[in-house]
Amino acid sequence: MRLDNPIGIYLLLWPTLWALFLASEGFPDLKLLLIFVLGVVLMRSAGCVINDYADRYIDKLVERTKHRPITSGEIHHRSALKFFVLLIMLAFLLVLLTNWLTIQLAMIAVLLAILYPFTKRWTYFPQFVLGLAFAMSVLMAFSATLNEIPITAWYVFAATVIWTVIYDTMYAMADREEDLKIGIKSSAILFAKFDRLIIGILQIIFLLILIKISNVFNLTISYHITLLLVTLLMIYHQYLIKNNENYSYLHGFLHNNYIGMVIFIGIVLSVGL
């Protein structure tokens, strides 16, 4: 579940909170807020379990992952699969407290979560699939709040997908050399020596979508100020990954948490006060 390393929970939680506060104009229903926060913890934990299950043979070949519980034999893979099902069932019970549209979206989200760890075997875009899986929480937040998915929600969806590709590519850059040896695919391998350039282009697109979100949701100057901070953070991330060191790549990945947090603060200041 990796609750001792909650960065994955944070990175999934921020877009979910963006969507909840935008959909509710700053005042989300407390019940929905609790449902989605707990749902994020459960689904991210389930995602970690199914990822480690799918990669249990691959992880043995990678220094950073060879001591994970399933790979090392500390936890039997069948027990892990049963635990994954339990987590999914608990998350589904939470979704049952919403509406039918959100339940349907949750089913798609589960399928994407299961698909993601296997995509690295046959496509260079597992990061994009992860982005789709994470962004489903955005659509679910809008549907649970409004019982529909307005066109404006798709801007938040797109921003989440692109942001996920950005930070997960940084994460994949740390494993690139070992992934090449064992035949695992990723956007980091596809981008190769152009990785910083392409990440930079994606960062610009991400920022442009965030500006569009400001327009369609009529956000105030508080949000615009936070976008300046987001821009500075992305410049800093470019500085980090230029060092071509695994530590720097992972630092850049972890530091993206602040981007999610800053955007959330900007949204709250714009619509909730």
UniProtKB/Swiss-Prot annotation:
Q: Which GO terms describe its cellular component?
A: plasma membrane
Q: What PROSITE patterns does the entry give?
A: UBIA
Question: Entry's HAMAP family?
Answer: UbiA
Which transformation does this protein catalyse, written as a reaction?
A: all-trans-octaprenyl diphosphate + 4-hydroxybenzoate = 4-hydroxy-3-(all-trans-octaprenyl)benzoate + diphosphate
Concerning Pfam families, the annotation shows: UbiA
Q: In which pathway does it act?
A: Cofactor biosynthesis; ubiquinone biosynthesis
Single GO term (MF): 4-hydroxybenzoate polyprenyltransferase activity
Q: Which PANTHER family match?
A: 4-HYDROXYBENZOATE POLYPRENYLTRANSFERASE, MITOCHONDRIAL (PTHR11048:SF28), PRENYLTRANSFERASES (PTHR11048)
Keywords in alphabetical order: Cell inner membrane, Cell membrane, Magnesium, Membrane, Transferase, Transmembrane, Transmembrane helix, Ubiquinone biosynthesis
**Keyword S-adenosyl-L-methionine carried by entry:** no
Keyword Cell membrane appears in the UniProt entry: yes
Q: Could you tell me which InterPro entries the record lists for this protein?
A: HB_polyprenyltransferase-like (IPR006370), Prenyltransferase (IPR039653), UbiA_prenyltransferase (IPR000537), UbiA_prenylTrfase_CS (IPR030470), UbiA_sf (IPR044878)
| Origin species | Vesicomyosocius okutanii subsp. Calyptogena okutanii (strain HA)
The protein, known as? 4-hydroxybenzoate octaprenyltransferase
Stretches that traverse the bilayer: 7-27, 30-50, 83-103, 122-142, 146-166, 197-217, 221-241, 253-273
Describe the family membership recorded for this protein in Swiss-Prot or TrEMBL: Belongs to the UbiA prenyltransferase family.
Give the bilayer topology: Multi-pass membrane protein
GO terms, biological process: ubiquinone biosynthetic process
Function field:
Catalyzes the prenylation of para-hydroxybenzoate (PHB) with an all-trans polyprenyl group. Mediates the second step in the final reaction sequence of ubiquinone-8 (UQ-8) biosynthesis, which is the condensation of the polyisoprenoid side chain with PHB, generating the first membrane-bound Q intermediate 3-octaprenyl-4-hydroxybenzoate.
Q: Where in the cell is it found?
A: Cell inner membrane
> Highest lineage ranks of the organism?
Bacteria, Pseudomonadati, Pseudomonadota, Gammaproteobacteria, Candidatus Pseudothioglobaceae
